[in-house]
């Protein structure tokens, strides 16, 4: 297995670098792509499936993914990738709308693309174009494509785009069948998808969300309850603590009580988990802290209302208050496509912002969440092509 994968990786890397080599006057003139290579790991072998494509040589999934990853799009600064996608998708004959999310301090736009003039479609492929900090440059190492967003979630964006382009070239989708939606702000507060829910005025029967699921169908994922706690004390000399009140000590004690609380569990999603992400405050070691702050993130498996009540009992007091940053319940998803593996996920997505709509919702995408957000984020070549195949399969299943 190791030898077969390494040979495949070598062929892909050599082919890609020959294709994009600056030594050449331009892309190799192979006419039209005959290496729309989609690799599928089947049992103990790597099988190459070649799709004859109507897309010009040099215009392929790997080069689109490279372009996306090379554009820095940290949360709050996504305008360059939005503009790139608008130009790219228009060049493929799609109608493209930029939905303004905010203009201050920077322009932030969602991207919505479809065939012809029919804005409402049966299926929408959607993902997010923002990434976490810090930006990491694009590079290839063996069969791995590194860079910030290479996995989460520009692999999904690229694979979804090529799924639509290939289905168009194969004559399998018509106006009103399929659209693309790429949003900003997923990694921070979901502002992009919230704006879609409130203002886009487009309807779908099926939404396929793109996130790293190792190309498995998500059965469900945990919810988010994220909040900040502000504690208030009275500063005094630490030699006379009875004269004051330490905001830090109070905050720590309340956080320990939260950590010791048995939060609601789910048979499917497992336990709710708590992370005290940051604690800050105080002026010096010899002064009782007058102010303190903690950032808390609870991954909610069940009964988010009860968990919120617990947090408010602990932190909405005469000495402190909470500010809710994110509040979204656990999600239970559609996974009815025969022959596709499934997975339960501990992270959260933008799905809750559309969950009140009467439509089917799927979660699927290339890459592993374990490789996302870290200093060595990557997706493999085979994962990208498998993701492309998976999106096409899901679209066609729901258009049948």
From Swiss-Prot:
Its main location: secreted. Zn(2+) 1 binds at residues 152, 187. Residues 1-25 form the signal peptide. GO terms for cellular component: extracellular region. Binds 2 Zn(2+) ions per subunit. It comes from the Eukaryota. The active site is at 186 (proton acceptor). Pfam families: M20_dimer, Peptidase_M20. It is found in: Secreted. Its cofactor is Zn(2+). GO terms for biological process: cellular detoxification; glutathione catabolic process; proteolysis. Keywords: Glycoprotein, Hydrolase, Metal-binding, Protease, Secreted, Signal, Zinc. Belongs to the peptidase M20A family. This is Peptidase M20 domain-containing protein C757.05c. It comes from Schizosaccharomyces pombe (strain 972 / ATCC 24843).
């Amino acid at each position: 297995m190791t030898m077969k994968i390494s040979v495949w990786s070598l062929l892909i890397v050599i082919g890609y670098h020959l294709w994009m080599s600056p030594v050449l006057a331009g892309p190799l003139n192979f006419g039209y792509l005959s290496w729309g290579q989609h690799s599928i790991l089947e049992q103990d072998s790597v099988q190459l499936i070649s799709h004859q494509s109507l897309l010009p040589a040099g215009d392929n999934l790997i080069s689109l993914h490279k372009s996306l990853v090379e554009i820095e799009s940290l949360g709050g600064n996504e305008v360059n990738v939005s503009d790139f996608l608008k130009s790219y998708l228009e060049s493929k004959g799609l109608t493209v709308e930029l939905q303004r999310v905010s203009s201050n301090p920077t322009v932030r736009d969602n991207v919505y693309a479809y065939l012809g003039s029919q804005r409402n479609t049966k299926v929408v492929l959607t993902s997010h174009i923002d990434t976490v900090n810090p930006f990491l440059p694009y590079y290839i190492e063996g069969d791995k494509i590194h860079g910030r967003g290479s996995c989460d979630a520009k692999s999904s964006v690229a694979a979804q785009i090529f799924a639509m382009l290939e289905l168009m070239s194969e004559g399998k989708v018509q106006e009103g069948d399929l659209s693309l939606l790429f949003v900003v702000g997923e990694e921070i507060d979901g502002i992009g998808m919230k704006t879609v829910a409130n203002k886009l005025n487009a309807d779908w029967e099926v939404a396929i969300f793109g996130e790293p699921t190792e190309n498995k169908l998500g059965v469900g994922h945990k919810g988010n309850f994220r909040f900040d706690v502000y504690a208030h004390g009275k500063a005094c000399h630490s030699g006379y603590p009875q004269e004051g009140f330490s905001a830090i000590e109070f905050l720590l004690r309340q956080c320990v009580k939260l950590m010791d609380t048995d939060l609601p569990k789910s048979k499917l999603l497992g336990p709710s988990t708590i992370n005290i992400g940051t604690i800050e405050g105080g002026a010096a070691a010899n002064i009782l802290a007058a102010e303190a702050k903690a950032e808390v993130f609870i991954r909610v498996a069940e009964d988010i209302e009860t968990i919120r009540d617990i947090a408010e009992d602990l932190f909405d007091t005469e000495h402190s208050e909470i500010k809710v940053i994110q509040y979204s319940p656990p999600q239970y998803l559609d996974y009815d496509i025969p022959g596709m593996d499934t997975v339960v996920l501990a992270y959260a997505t933008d799905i809750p912002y559309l969950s009140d709509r009467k439509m089917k919702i799927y979660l699927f995408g290339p890459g592993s969440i374990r490789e996302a957000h870290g200093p060595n984020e990557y997706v493999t070549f085979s994962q990208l092509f498998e993701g492309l195949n998976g999106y096409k399969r899901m679209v066609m299943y729901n258009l049948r």
